[in-house]
């Protein structure tokens, strides 16, 4: 089983696993540490996500009602790409999430909003470390079994922070008049004064559509879903399409890549600097193309699902 989110999302299954000694792979090394602490009976290993490749695409048939033909995908030349910058992912309005908190009693509301404000101020801290600190501040010493249940019960905090920063990054670019093509649902619900610069496709999209959008872009923007020692597949998918990956960082990414060599990092803490960074990148397409090509070489050699499958097989035959 590959846990594609923090283990707190899977507490009920992990506490009573459906298969004895179920083997678990986590996509973030902090998630691995969390598993070893709170679910020590389950074998767990680190397995970073990989990128998705477009192998073929359908060319529409000139005859109405007929299926198109499958053709091998060809890389779109960097200078001829349709989009300057794309983001692939849905948006959940944070106001909707806050309403759930507002339904709680006054004491709980204060507790939850203190956590949210602390996470906004310290986005480098993992969700479980932040939640544990606030739980212990409120309740003192708590046994690990009770602590893991309490953390799992606050999954909405993680969802809130993902949505908050996703919205803030897109809004930051739009309000500086930098057009961003977003592929995903609900972006019209983002509280932003510059919606003309958020070009929406208006619906949920599948992985193939996401990869195709990234393949036709010069820059693929990533906002990490609170992975502090792992990565999201958007990073490697961009690299495999010869597209520059622009992402907030993590310890794992810093260990494996160099800023402005195979990708470009920005800071959530200093997101006000992002618009100027994007403008400078778009002014230097040749440099962007060089970074994208180095990213491709790295990803195709080490970060495809074929290589991840080989790693799993090697682990299973140990």
Which residues fall in each region the model found?
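Active-site proximal beta-strand in glycosyltransferases
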Residues: 1-6, 23-26, 49
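Active-site donor-binding loop signature of nucleotide-sugar glycosyltransferases
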Residues: 4, 49, 90, 267-268
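A conserved, positively charged/aromatic
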Residues: 12-25
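Catalytic binding pocket for nucleotide-activated donors in carbohydrate/polymer assembly enzymes
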Residues: 17-19, 34-40, 61, 78, ...
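A short, active-site helix/loop in glycosyltransferases that binds the activated sugar's phosphate group
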Residues: 24-42
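Cationic, low-complexity basic patches in intrinsically disordered or flexible, solvent-exposed regions
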Residues: 71-73
